[in-house]
Amino acid sequence: WERIYVTGKGTGSTAYPQMTLSTIVGSGTYYRLGLPAPASLPSTPVLSNKDSSATIPTGAATPSLLIDQESPKSISYVVTYVSTYGEEGPPSQPLLANIVDVYSDQNVTVTFPANPSGYGNIAKKRLYRTDTSGTYRRVKDSNYSAATVLDDLTESELQEALPSSSWEAPPDEVTSGDYGHKDGPMLGLVAMPNGILAGFSGQTICFSEAFLPHAWPRDYQLTAKSDIVALAPMTSGLLVLT
């Protein structure tokens, strides 16, 4: 990948785990490691008829000509951020207000939440929606600057399932909400033989997804009895020094 991942660089508000390109290490831009979950979608998606010339009956509850012919599908939407390097972050929190009943002759316009600050390497927003089984599947990507996106796909046109539901950023005391950590930002970053990175924060040992250094599921964390001071990778595991 030709990237460098570091912890313990910077002070105060810049003490978070970081990454940069190996070709510019020492002189290039460092980015916060991991991506944030977007805020929940700010409003109920807006429905429109696929046929812009369709005459919708006056007083119709929704812009569809199929109300008496089929049952609508209840669809929920979430969005993720994707970095310049193709890394994908966790999804927004789905809300009841984001669920909409859709007929087969309708399109849906989704409004994105406001963009976060402090993440200069986000390039895209990726929209997902539920299929008939309740699985979130990819709809399409939009530019980071986009305010809305049109979902005009049929279910058969949906792409892969959402892979990043647990892909949090590593512990980082600078960020807030689910990504804050009482013991501060992750330190002691090491690479293990199986493609997994490990680090620590206080008494917490953190592990990344294999070969995905930006993804640090909370379910993978372990707790030591004492504060951790260093980690050392071994062929058969990880040595934890307290």
Where are these regions (language model features)?
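Disordered, low-complexity "stalk" and linker segments at domain junctions of extracellular
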Residues: W1-G195, S201-Q203, F207, P213-D219
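Beta-sheet-dominated scaffold domains
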Residues: E2-R3, G195-I196, K225-T242
